[in-house]
Amino acid sequence: VTTATATWVNREATAEELIPLIGKLHRENGVVLSIHGRSLVNKSVIELLKLHDFVSHIDGAPLNPAHTLELVRALAELNLGACSINIAALHKAHREAGSPELSMWLPEQLGSSVNHQGDQPKEQDVVLYGFGRIGRLLARILLERSSSPLGSGLNLRAVVVRKNGDKDLVKRASLLERDSVHGPFKGVIEVDEENSTIIANGVPVRFIYSSDPTTVDYTEYGINDALLVDNTGRWRDVPGLEQHLNRPGISRVLLTAPGKGDMKNIVFGVNDNVITDEDKIVSAASCTTNAITPALKVLDDAYGVERGHVETVHAFTNDQNLIDNFHKGDRRGRSAVLNMVITETGAAKAVSKALPQLEGKLTGNAIRVPTPDVSMAILNVKLTKPAGSAEELNELFRRESIDGELRRQVGYSDSPEAVSTDFVGSRTAGVVDSLATVVTDDSAIVYVWYDNEFGYSCQVIRVLERMGGYDVPSYPAK
């Protein structure tokens, strides 16, 4: 047996020891362990080892699984309450502190969560109105958290859809279970047709059939004070969405599309602080606005943005035709799988709803391309203060992705082989492709990849958590 093989076998053995410890902390304490935003919960041995190697792209060297095991064993002794812990950042902080005794050092770092095991975080009922691409991904994210009764916070109770035939529920369960882009559902799904219920990972989700939001009484299903997520895009103004708000059992509404009028458009991480208890209807903006606004904020905070143009190379969507057919929009009637289609986007102008200082400074266009998921935004901006070099600008984004305020929104890639499918399942709003960055005098061009389905859905969940008052501590504290 070679030395390399023996080392690999030891790493596998260490990862195998980690799995039950990570699972127990999640189930019994509501603790979510992660590595720079990538959850360790329900991961296989190989997935855990790949996540440890990923750290080299951020910190310059991989994270040793043995160090993680030492940390996790120590964490398991602290009777922690629900919280989120970045193991890579915690290990780095421990090393920089001189590697003191963990039993003494960890309680100082996690003080507010130590000896709080069993504390029940605020629970919030959630209803999904619609079950399309975004609706099903929101359901997946909510259900993957359900294995921890102490850390779920948001409880998916029901989905409202129009009935399409006798096998409607079975087909919807199949669509939740299998996805051509995002792969199989991570869990077990059962169908209870008699009670119009899908049971996913032991969680019953009632399917309510209705084509009119004004006819549903949610209290009849034991649902009270719920957050309703309208992911149909059918209504985008306050009067339309108030149809939900006026129904028994619903207290607030979140729209997964750009809102019209005076509705607050929220890009989590940028302007979620403006949400108040009085805001009964809120928009989570669009996938593209969520992808570009955090990156633009980083640029504006550091250098100032005088003006700019945003070009989005966007995956095709359900709104387009498979083959040429009539469409009310210009060019969108042409085949989505055979053509690049120039179209309009309101994402650039919508940025100002989250960053008012950029109002009137941005223009935008979009090109729909024949790929089902993952898009790219090209930010071409004139800066008030020159960035100096591409290396300086990239370092700014790299640091932001590690420990900045926008680390959950801004990702960073330095791979010379990265292509669009590599970003399927990305949980950040956007990922800066550092090798494509161009800086010339006071101009900069930044390329941002984004999973326009899953990455956006993660942002929607974050807004939901803020609206529901679900806010667990994150460590290490910034």
Name each model-derived stretch.
Residues 205-207, 362, 446:
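Generic structural signal for residues in well-ordered beta-strands
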Residues 46-118, 364, 380-478:
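C-terminal active-site/capping subdomain that shapes the small-molecule cofactor and substrate pocket
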Residues 2-49, 302-442:
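C-terminal substrate-binding/catalytic lobe of Rossmann-fold NAD(P)-dependent dehydrogenases
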Residues 2-321, 329, 462-463, 470, ...:
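N-terminal Rossmann-like NAD(P) cofactor-binding subdomain of oxidoreductases
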Residues 139, 233, 249, 258, ...:
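Residue-level marker of positions within ordered structural domains that often coincide
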Residues 123-130, 281-283, 377-384, 444-450:
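Short glycine-rich or small-residue beta-strand-to-loop segments that form or flank ligand, phosphate
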